[in-house]
């Protein structure tokens, strides 16, 4: 655990599919909170002292493992991965998805169960598909920014 995480002053980004990295950077600059961008391989990111990049490698769940190991009380994790969110909540982190929804200890069990049911349904459709997610919108981006500000205020 680093000094950053001991102080509860760290934002961890599950970076491979995160559409709100720029919003996170902007907010981090304003609050002077370090950001650790974690991904399987290199992602472009600002050259700024608050931003660090961790390349976790291609092993299955390598990036998730790096994030879960750094998760601690007071850290903020941004991920769309429900199973990673569950691990981070267990470690005491505040966890948001990229649309600004908060994963909580009260809701994560139902979200994990729903994920499992949907995976079973998709597997049973044998390539027919059930549609994907709606495109990421400006409203989603705004909702995330508002939720991020609220979450960071709770970390102080």
Swiss-Prot record:
Domain of life: Bacteria
InterPro entries on file: UPF0178 (IPR003791)
Family: Belongs to the UPF0178 family.
Name of the protein described by the UniProt record: UPF0178 protein Jann_2168
Organism annotation: Jannaschia sp. (strain CCS1)
């Amino acid at each position: 655990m680093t000094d950053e995480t001991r102080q509860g002053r760290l934002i961890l980004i599950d970076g491979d599919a995160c559409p709100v990295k720029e919003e996170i950077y902007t907010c981090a600059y304003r609050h002077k909170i370090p950001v650790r961008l974690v991904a399987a391989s290199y992602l472009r990111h600002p050259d700024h002292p608050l931003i660090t990049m961790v390349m976790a490698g291609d092993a299955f769940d390598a990036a998730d493992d790096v994030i879960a190991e750094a998760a601690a009380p007071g850290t903020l994790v941004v991920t769309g991965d429900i199973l990673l969110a569950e691990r981070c909540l267990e470690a005491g982190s505040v966890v948001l998805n990229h649309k600004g929804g908060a994963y909580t200890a009260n809701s994560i069990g139902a979200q994990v169960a729903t994920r499992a049911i949907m995976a079973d349904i998709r597997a049973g459709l044998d390539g027919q598909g059930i549609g994907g997610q709606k495109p990421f919108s400006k409203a989603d981006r705004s909702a995330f920014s508002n939720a991020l500000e609220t979450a960071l205020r709770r970390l102080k």
